[in-house]
């Protein structure tokens, strides 16, 4: 019995010892495995932290290795919210939702595009309508300005015509007629004065002014005023003084040359006539240079000045 009992005890002791041995050897093996793993990981980390060796190609350019982040890159499935084993059902749901969102975004963009096109068309139509309205307004303003200018021109012409009519009336009222003066002038001159007031003359712009065109003598050298006609204005009011003044002026004052006849146009003396030979005694002009009008009497010159207005400058004919 003892042997039999010892047998199981031995067997149990051996089993317990073996179990203890195994249990005791188990922690040791785990520690050894951990130390081996740490030893294996340490060189790898050291190798990662150590600067990579420089590699140069044939031309001497340094070719650096890839970055650590690129070497440790992970696939896209690692960053997805649904795991790979989490199912293809979740992926299909996500794909359907994204497709619906993309379709809705495309539809909204299309609607916005249509709205933008419609707004641009409205803006263009508004701009064209504004341009047309501005052009019409400018044309209307130009037309109004033209009508205003035309009205102003007509008004100025009417005022000018009225002023000329008033001036003519004033001259007719204040100009003493030859017949009313009774100063001894012939009836022909009174008729000439009436013609000057009522009819056309050689000087249309002087018809409203009491100026006789016969007072002016036209020559190639210029326009001169007749000396004997200077006293015509005083003949009507002071006839005796006018006659005396004309007699004195014709006797003492020197008359001018006409400048139109052939003797007046000559510039050189003949040196053959008596006037040229006796220049010291007579102080006369060359006979071939004497004016034909100066050869006539002063009274004849006065009569020619008193010609009617319409027949002015008749002595040149």
Curated annotation (Swiss-Prot):
Location (main, coarse): nucleus
Pfam families linked: zf-CXXC
Residue span of motif Nuclear localization signal: 252-257
Keyword Zinc set for record: yes
Zinc finger (CXXC-type): 251-292
InterPro entries associated with the record: CXXC4/CXXC5 (IPR040388), Znf_CXXC (IPR002857)
Bias (Gly residues): 83-94
Record-listed Zn(2+) 2 binding positions: 270, 273, 276, 286
Keyword Acetylation: no
Entry GO terms, CC: cytosol; nucleoplasm; nucleus
Biased composition annotated in UniProt, kind: Low complexity: 1-49
GO molecular function: DNA-binding transcription factor binding; methyl-CpG binding; sequence-specific DNA binding; zinc ion binding
Keywords associated with the record: Cytoplasm, DNA-binding, Metal-binding, Nucleus, Zinc, Zinc-finger
GO terms classed as biological process: negative regulation of transcription by RNA polymerase II; regulation of generation of precursor metabolites and energy
Chain intervals for the UniProt region annotation (Disordered): 1-96
Ligand binding (Zn(2+) 1): 258, 261, 264, 291
Subcellular location: Nucleus; Cytoplasm
Primary role: May indirectly participate in activation of the NF-kappa-B and MAPK pathways. Acts as a mediator of BMP4-mediated modulation of canonical Wnt signaling activity in neural stem cells. Required for DNA damage-induced ATM phosphorylation, p53 activation and cell cycle arrest. Involved in myelopoiesis. Binds to the oxygen responsive element of COX4I2 and represses its transcription under hypoxia conditions (4% oxygen), as well as normoxia conditions (20% oxygen). May repress COX4I2 transactivation induced by CHCHD2 and RBPJ.
Record comment regarding domains: The CXXC zinc finger mediates binding to CpG-DNA.
Assembly and interaction partners: Interacts with DVL1. Interacts with RBPJ.
UniProt-recorded name of the protein: CXXC-type zinc finger protein 5
Organism the protein comes from: Bos taurus
Encoding gene (name): CXXC5
